[in-house]
Curated annotation (Swiss-Prot):
It comes from Mus musculus. This is Speriolin-like protein. It comes from the Eukaryota. The modification Phosphoserine is found at S63, S136. The keyword Cytoplasm applies. The keyword Phosphoprotein applies. Pfam families: Speriolin_C, Speriolin_N. Belongs to the speriolin family. Keywords: Cytoplasm, Phosphoprotein.
Length: 342
């Protein structure tokens, strides 16, 4: 009889401990919800106070016209981005606006994670409940660790996108330079279709440059903006005797230097942007079919293309991407052809 009474008393004690553990788990869930709501509200107030630098203006319309001759499209585009020198972008992106989201913490989130917890439980009550939880031998270590983990989970805070662009109208000596590295390309995001338009912008600019430097050449396989000087020498060699056609060499060189001089006024760099265009094409790809301007007005709207680039391209590469779009718009305006003419 005494053994039965002792067993009953022990079962009742264990049952009370189990109820206490369940109550603690519910309180942990409530604390987690309070912490999350408080941090989101504080971060929401802080993000509304941030100032966004203005995006430079670009031509809002291009004169419609007939597309240029179809020179074909890239046969294959690698899935992995090409590697550029680590300092290849330092001459194009200015540092008047901070770009790295890791450089500064979001305002209002430093202390909010502790305030709801302290206001919900006093230190003495919290200490007593933690002590009670350690008394129960029936709660598995896995359940205990999960209960504690709910209070320590990191909160993902959405931060506003910062935009920086090259100030090509400033004197060279007045510009502040900063180096950015291509191994930070992990922030690239966006739908595949929209991303292909970013690569298409770079592709169309390259094709426009090649078509201008090499007029009449319909097969541009192996031609890139980066190797234009080498290709000028190759195309200037006479096929009959292998001698150099000096007249053709001077003509092609003059066309190349004239065009790059016009683009350099917009901030284009022969050392940086040809390789950067290849990088965008390899990263995003290009449109699978020749753009249909009547079916998709986006391809003929500089404003819509600029908004798409801002939404997709990471901040550290946004300035140079917008510069390529600006150059494409200027060339399209001068030759009276659509933006996507090839």
């Amino acid at each position: 009889m005494a053994e039965g009474s002792e067993l009953m008393s022990r079962l009742m004690s264990e049952n009370a401990d189990l109820k206490k553990q369940v109550r603690l788990l519910k309180e942990n869930q409530m604390l987690k919800r309070l912490l999350s709501e408080s941090c989101q509200e504080s971060c929401g107030r802080g993000s509304r106070d941030l100032l966004y630098p203005k995006v430079p203006t670009y031509p809002e319309a291009c004169s419609p016209g007939n597309g240029g001759p179809d020179f074909g499209r890239f046969a294959g585009v690698p899935d992995t981005p090409s590697q550029l020198p680590t300092s290849s972008l330092e001459d194009l992106l200015c540092s008047h606006a901070p770009l790295s989201s890791e450089d500064e913490a979001s305002p209002g989130c430093a202390t909010t994670s502790q305030m709801p917890f302290k206001s919900f439980l006093s230190p003495s009550e919290l200490h007593s409940r933690i002590a009670d939880r350690k008394l129960s031998p029936l709660l598995s270590p896995l359940q205990d660790s999960l209960a504690d983990k709910t209070l320590l989970e990191p909160r993902e805070i959405s931060r506003p996108k910062k935009v920086c662009f090259s100030e090509s109208n400033l004197p060279t000596g007045d510009r502040s330079r900063r180096t950015y590295y291509l191994n930070e390309i992990q922030s690239f995001s966006g739908a595949e279709k929209d991303g292909r338009i970013v690569g298409e912008i770079a592709f169309q600019l390259d094709r426009r440059i090649l078509a201008y430097v090499f007029p009449g050449v319909t097969r541009l396989y192996g031609f890139t903006v980066s190797n234009i000087p080498e290709k000028i020498k190759q195309t200037s060699i006479k096929s009959l005797d292998g001698s150099v056609d000096e007249k053709k060499l001077r003509e092609l060189t003059h066309r190349y230097l004239t065009l790059t001089a016009r683009l350099e006024k917009l901030g284009y760099s022969r050392e940086v942007h040809p390789v950067f265009s290849e990088f965008l094409i390899n990263t995003y790809g290009i449109l699978k079919q020749r753009p249909d301007l009547r079916a998709n007005p986006l391809h003929s709207s500089p404003a819509a293309l600029r908004k798409l680039v801002i939404d997709i391209v990471p901040p550290k590469f946004l300035g140079d991407s917008l510069l390529l779009l600006n150059c494409l718009c200027e060339l399209s305006k001068e030759d009276s052809k659509p933006l996507f003419a090839w």
